[in-house]
Design a protein with these regions (language model features):
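Amphipathic, hydrophobic secondary-structure cores in small proteins
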Residues: 2-59
């Protein structure tokens, strides 16, 4: 992820679960994680942010792409 890049975090409560979505402000790429509603928002946001970083890396690195 580029330094100073903007990441938006969205939380959607769905019953006993929360969906946290991290969105890259520059590219619009999204990554989501789901966890229990009792989980701290900071933990879900961190997991979504890490997943977004992985997805962005996967898009640019041929070694991480599947067959």
């Amino acid at each position: 992820m580029p330094a100073g890049g903007e990441i938006f975090i969205e939380f959607v409560i769905q019953g006993n679960f929360v969906k946290a979505t991290a969105i890259d402000g520059a590219s619009g790429v999204e990554a989501s994680v789901v966890g229990p509603a009792s989980a701290p928002q900071a933990a879900l946001a961190d997991a979504a942010r890490r997943k977004l970083e992985y997805v962005l890396k996967k898009k640019t690195s041929p070694s991480l792409k599947g067959p």
